[in-house]
């Protein structure tokens, strides 16, 4: 009898656990004053678990570069703390990447809203012109 396929791979579960632990560590354990309000948005782990890309955002965009420096300099400490919290043969090297998906999403939303406004103005004027034209034809 074949085993039922699980919904998530082991690397997905490891990435999720790393994300949870890093969120807690950056909130409580990261004492670097350069680090702003950090949100860990996603973690991707390589198949061999040797590297992990950690995606993050910050509340204040002006602290973005300083936060990147703080995370890069704290990577060893965070990896060590992860090793204490998560029992793995080898903890992956952490690579921090700023997640600009929220900014891209807001930009796309503003573009969609702009086009919708332009269409409403364009078609609203055309519809008003048609209504006036119908009244004159009688």
From Swiss-Prot:
InterPro entries per record: KH_dom-like_a/b (IPR015946), RbfA (IPR000238), RbfA_dom_sf (IPR023799), Ribosome-bd_factorA_CS (IPR020053)
Location (main, coarse): cytoplasm
Keywords: Cytoplasm, Ribosome biogenesis
UniProt GO cellular component terms: cytosol
GO biological process terms held by the UniProt record: maturation of SSU-rRNA
Subcellular location: Cytoplasm
Tagged with keyword Cytoplasm: yes
GO MF assignments: ribosomal small subunit binding
Subunit field text: Monomer. Binds 30S ribosomal subunits, but not 50S ribosomal subunits or 70S ribosomes.
Function: One of several proteins that assist in the late maturation steps of the functional core of the 30S ribosomal subunit. Associates with free 30S ribosomal subunits (but not with 30S subunits that are part of 70S ribosomes or polysomes). Required for efficient processing of 16S rRNA. May interact with the 5'-terminal helix region of 16S rRNA.
HAMAP family per record: RbfA
Similarity section: Belongs to the RbfA family.
Name this protein carries in UniProt: Ribosome-binding factor A
UniProt organism field: Chromobacterium violaceum (strain ATCC 12472 / DSM 30191 / JCM 1249 / CCUG 213 / NBRC 12614 / NCIMB 9131 / NCTC 9757 / MK)
């Amino acid at each position: 009898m074949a085993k039922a396929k699980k919904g998530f791979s082991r690397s997905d579960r490891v990435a999720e656990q790393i994300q949870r632990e890093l969120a807690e560590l950056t909130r409580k354990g990261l004492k670097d004053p350069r680090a702003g309000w950090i949100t860990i948005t996603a973690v991707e782990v390589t198949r061999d678990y040797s590297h992990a890309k950690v995606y993050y955002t910050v509340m204040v965009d002006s602290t973005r570069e300083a936060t990147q420096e703080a995370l890069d300099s704290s990577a060893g400490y965070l990896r060590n703390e992860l090793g204490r919290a998560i029992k793995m043969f080898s903890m992956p090297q952490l690579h921090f990447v700023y997640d600009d998906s929220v900014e891209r999403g807001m930009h796309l939303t503003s573009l969609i809203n702009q086009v919708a406004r332009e269409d409403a103005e364009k078609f609203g004027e055309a519809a008003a012109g048609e209504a006036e034209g119908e009244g004159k034809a009688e």
